[in-house]
Amino acid sequence: MSLEYDLVIIGATAAARSAAIEAVNLQARVALILPQSSGDLLHPQRDFYPYALAQIAKTSQPDRTRLQSPSSYPWKYARAAIDRLEQPSSPALLAAMGIDTIIGTGEFCRRPHLAFNIDRRYLRARAYLIATGSIAHYPLIPGIQETGYVTLDRLPSLIDGNPNRKQVVPRRWAIIGSESIGVELAQTLAKLGCKVTLIVETAQILPYEDRDLANLIQAQLEAEGVKIYLGAVVTSVRAEDTTKLVIIGTDSIAVDEIFIALPDRPLLESFNLVGVGVDYTEKGISIDNKLQTSHRQIYACGSVCGNVLGGYQSQSLTSYEAKIAVRNALNRRKTKVDYQSYNNLPWAVYTDPPLARVGMTSDTAINSHRDLIILQQYFKTCPQAILSNLTSGFCKIVVTRSGQILGAEIICENAPELIQILAIAIQQKLTIVNLTTFPCLSPSYAEFIDRAAQEWHTYHRDRNHSSGWFAPIEALRQLSAAVHRLCWWK
């Protein structure tokens, strides 16, 4: 029996769809299986929904004040924006590109040959790619299932996109969990006129971030009206009439809706992975550095493998892996993924102002390296920030004494764009001095790099100056030691 396809991709995620487009561009025969049970079938770009909400919250607040009451308009705007993002990868357009798009539930089978069985149709291919992504964990909170809650999967469907239908937006929210999406959404909802309570089990919000930056974000949220419980555990949840009660110790919080911001779990159910010899754990599918599973014809990428970036699941990382997996599945010459290099991929938390980082945080670097310099610059002295009246924020750049950049953390209006400069510098192994060899636009936020380099030069100048004072003393000490050895020998 001949092979029907070169590559069969399983998953409705944005990464699965981009992988299908990548494969068809390589002249491959491609089938894309969109599982019916996947929430990503309706919203493959769901990760961008809170960001779209945040954008409309910012543009509706020219004076940076809270809206007095929540409106359904921002939600409908965000839904429309997501719909536009999803148009280029809709099933109809994918089919027009020559991709066989099949909606349904299926599983792998190994007899008489390896195939993917969907509605009794056996799809045979040279290789298979699993990019099903992840879904929300079921929170282990007494009463939560009976009371009801919202996750990122369900958030776009909370308010539909019908502009003519009047809908009520929940006014009081409890957000439970320490994932970055919870912090982002808490701030956005507060700006949209909602009363928000953020509950995290950790000692700080954004536990993977530098404490100074996390504290600055926390102060910003509290200034905007978000009530934050740190190191708190929700003991139970119950419903009373139209109100939901969240119990934290002796405190009882009355809300209209609960959002769960816990880490997702890999979507692995019903694919018969054990039957075809694909190893996996509760954290995800086991893969090697070529994104190949324990079955040589089956590849996997993204959050279904449990891969994270900066402590969080990342759509950009998933898309990066999807391209490599497609090329490895179709070519004999394999590209290896350097998992250590994941530490040098940029990451951002889209609060206002946003936080971005790459490489090591200052806390991590101090624990693992010696002779470090933490270069710190505040944007309140940056001309562009002053002209834009957006002076909140600062940056930390972790460098060695030789100038090698180990990591950077930035919090300011343009942090996601600025971090790209330092990410490329780390990847290309440039020093902080190398970054000053080309002129920087002025005024611009990027001027902080020049200022950081000046700080590094000042440190070395002062250090060398201090060393000069002690050089004669060191010479006398060495001479005394030599004389002592000579006398002892005689």
Residue ranges and their predicted role:
Residues 18-22, 301-364, 441-464:
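A conserved FAD-binding loop/helix module that cradles the flavin
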Residues 147-169, 257-331:
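FAD-site-proximal beta/loop scaffold in flavoenzymes
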Residues 8-10, 106, 114, 122-133, ...:
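Short hydrophobic core segments
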Residues 3-5, 118-127, 169, 248-257, ...:
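Core beta-strand elements of the Rossmann-like FAD/NAD(P) dinucleotide-binding domain
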Residues 10-18, 22-50, 55, 352-358, ...:
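Flexible, glycine-rich terminal cap/loop adjacent to redox cofactors
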Residues 5, 21-169, 205-206, 237-240, ...:
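Glycine-rich flavin
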